[in-house]
Amino acid sequence: MSTEHSKRAAKFTQNVEKTTWHDATFWSVRQKRDKMAQELPEWEDLREHASEIKMHTITHLADYLDMFSKNLESRGVKVHWAKDAQEFNEIVLGILKDHNVKKMVKSKSMLTEECEMNPYLEQHGIDVVETDLGERIIQLLGQKPSHIVMPAIHLKREEVGKMFEEKGISKEIGNYDPTYLTRCARHHLRDQFMEAGAGMTGCNFGVAATGDCVVCTNEGNADMTTSMPKLHIVAMGIEKLVPDYKSLAVFQRLLCRCGTGQPTTAFTSHFRQARPGAEMHVVLVDNGRSDILADKDHWQTLKCMRCGACMNTCPVYRRSGGYSYTYFIPGPIGVNLGMLKNPQKYSDNVSACTLCLSCDNVCPSKVGPGSQIYAWRQSLDKLGKADSVKKAMSNGMKYLFDRPALYTTALKFAPLVNLVPECCTHFSHWNAWGIGHAKPEFAKKSFHQLWKEGKVK
């Protein structure tokens, strides 16, 4: 059966040069991550500790949420609770309307992508400007992020340069030097910061013991977003909490090393309260996270810190791109989150996995995305989403393997497959595996026969 992912992936791989470049780009990030890990003898201890901290926090989430919100409110921060995406969007819109805001700048936030906040606000007359360079690029192109950390990594500098020329951001036609393009973007965004009436940030970590909202960036755009406007809104998923600074230190050592292969992000900003004369709001969002917590088989997805390491190492993601997935978060973690959101809608993505479990090996908080995808595959039949052809073949193989005599007899006829023309076995929608693979040749005698004849020892 041809899934939506496989159709999109086939389209992506038609451009062999770009596919190879995309693969190599992410593999280089994976190699940087490995180098960072090898420099720390305590690396595996850090991963284990991060997993334990997340497990503890999630299992005591109500207590930590209460502590976090009280610490914020004690310093004048207004805390809001959103049960779902719709309520989150309405809360944000209400805050902006109360302050008569027409333009809002924002730093990177996958939560706002999850809630589809930007189009909602734009429909209500609010101009939302992304200030992360990658996010701004894809916003101007009308695209979605293809990666949760490097949203525009699928684009080459020539594509970005031409778009900047069309939008009037770049003045030197044909100059696609990355440094020049970055400077053009900086000048373009400075005007947006000056004009905005509000700034929004995401939140990488919320420190319960102190009420800190911690934002990690490499561009400093979160600091500009909160420094210029007098209204600061923080969008935060309830799973982002850690107990204290000691716990935060563990995650800060892991996050950037796993995500981009750097020792740390260039900027780590802590927001505890509004600056004098300004106002700060924190919107804590559930949007299905409580349901995930109650799922005994897949609750560990809440341990994810959104570093993107599973995507950087995944051979399927690297060779098919982020837009091949039907859920807004691609890659191994996105497959799992999509299934938790709507298994009927996003079950196609489950096939986008080789089960190599490389993602399990690199995940800093030991979420085990590959192992969970395997578990999802086992439940496809119950969901009524199992591929009928694969199911029939599996049942046929089970029938054969349960009957040794029949299996042995069938092996004797296997060489007859060599006589079947390749056009009937390969390059056909009946056998997607055959595309790109040479036709295997069956030996005249099986290993079993050779063993019986004493020719194999």
Regions flagged by a language model, labelled:
Residues G134, P263-F267, S388-A392, C424-W430:
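Short coil/turn segments at secondary-structure boundaries
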Residues C307-M311, C356:
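Extended amphipathic alpha-helical segments enriched in small hydrophobics
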Residues M1, H5-A10, Q14-V29, M393-K457:
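Intrinsic disorder at enzyme termini
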Residues M1-D297:
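The feature marks the mature, well-folded catalytic cores of soluble enzymes
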Residues R275-T301, Y317-E422, H426, I435:
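Ferredoxin-type iron-sulfur electron-transfer modules in oxidoreductases and energy-metabolism complexes
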Residues D84, C310, G368-P369:
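Helix N-cap / loop-to-helix initiation motif
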Residues C304:
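Short Cys/His-rich zinc-binding micro-motifs
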